[in-house]
Amino acid sequence: MTLLEIMRPANCVMAGAASLTGMLVSGALLQSLHTPVLVFSAVLLITGGGNAINDYFDREIDAVNRPDRPIPSGRISPRAALIWSVALFIAGCLIAGLINQSCLALALLNSFVLIIYAARLKGLPVAGNIAISYLTGTTFLFGGLAASPSSITAFLSILSALATLSREIVKDIEDLPGDLAHGAKTLPAFIGKRKSFVLASLVLIVAMLLSYLVPLGIDYQAAVSIANLAFLLSIKRMLCGDASGSQRWIKMGMGMALVAFLIGYHI
C-alpha cells in the first residue's frame, strides 16, 4: 500500500484520463481497446514515477510540513522510493514504446522533465511553473500521438498548458506569505503580487483568444464561451486581489473548456 500511496494514485488516474481525452478528440479512442489501455497505463506509471521521485527530493521538507508522508514517516526508505520511481519510469516508457515511436519519445522527454523538476526546477521562479504547465498540456498530446495527431489535440494541449500556467502563478501568489517566510524563490516573491496577477491575467487572456481558433463547430464555440466566462470571473477576482477565488474559477473554467472540446467533437 505504501508503494501505491507514494504514487498518489488519484493524480495518476486523472493524468491517464486526460491522455484518453486527447486520444478521444483525435478520433481514435473507440477504434480498439488495446491502444487506450496502453496509453492510460503508460501515463499512469510515468505520473506515479514523477510523484514518487518528488517525494524523494522533498523528504526533508516533508519531515517538517508533512511528516505523515511515506518517507518521513519511515514506512519506506528514501532508497526504496528512488528505486520504485525509476522502475515506474522504465515501465511507463516501455509501454509507451509499444504504442509508437512518437509516444516513446514524449514519454522519455516527460520522464526527464519530471526528474529535473523534482530535483532542480521546483524551487526556481517561473521555470517550475512552466514545467508543470508543459507536463499538463503534453498529457493530452500523448493521447493524440497514440492516435492520429490533429490540430484539435494540439489546441487542447496548448490551452491546457496556458490555463495551468496562469493557475500556477496564482497559486504562488496565494502561498506568498509562507514562501517569503521560508525564502522560497517564487515569481511573486521577485516581482510582487500585483505584477504577478497581471501576468497570470495576460496568460489567461491569450488562452481565451486562442480558444476561438479551434476548428470545431458552433456547439464548441458556445460551450467554450461559457468556459471563458469563468476565466473572466477569475481575472475579476485577480483584480480584487483574491488568489483563492481566482484559482477556483480557473479550475472551473478548465473543466468547462474540456467539456467544450468534447461537445465540439459531438461526444
UniProtKB/Swiss-Prot annotation:
Enzyme Commission code(s) on record: 2.5.1.42
InterPro entries, sorted: DGGGP_synth, Prenyltransferase_related, UbiA_prenyltransferase, UbiA_sf
Keyword Lipid metabolism: yes
TM region positions: 10-30, 33-53, 80-100, 104-121, 139-159, 198-218, 247-267
Keywords of the record: Cell membrane, Lipid biosynthesis, Lipid metabolism, Magnesium, Membrane, Phospholipid biosynthesis, Phospholipid metabolism, Transferase, Transmembrane, Transmembrane helix
GO MF annotation list: geranylgeranylglycerol-phosphate geranylgeranyltransferase activity; magnesium ion binding
Function: Prenyltransferase that catalyzes the transfer of the geranylgeranyl moiety of geranylgeranyl diphosphate (GGPP) to the C2 hydroxyl of (S)-3-O-geranylgeranylglyceryl phosphate (GGGP). This reaction is the second ether-bond-formation step in the biosynthesis of archaeal membrane lipids.
Metabolic or biological pathway: Membrane lipid metabolism; glycerophospholipid metabolism
Enzyme class, first EC level, given as a word: transferase
Name used for this protein in its record: Digeranylgeranylglyceryl phosphate synthase
Top-level taxon of the source organism: Archaea
Cystines in this chain: none
Gene Ontology CC annotation, any one: plasma membrane
Cofactors required: Mg(2+)
Catalytic activity: sn-3-O-(geranylgeranyl)glycerol 1-phosphate + (2E,6E,10E)-geranylgeranyl diphosphate = 2,3-bis-O-(geranylgeranyl)-sn-glycerol 1-phosphate + diphosphate
Bilayer topology: Multi-pass membrane protein
Organism: Methanothrix thermoacetophila (strain DSM 6194 / JCM 14653 / NBRC 101360 / PT) (Methanosaeta thermophila)
PANTHER family: CHLOROPHYLL SYNTHASE, CHLOROPHYLL SYNTHASE, CHLOROPLASTIC
Subcellular location: Cell membrane
GO BP, sorted A to Z: glycerophospholipid biosynthetic process
Family membership noted in the UniProt record: Belongs to the UbiA prenyltransferase family. DGGGP synthase subfamily.
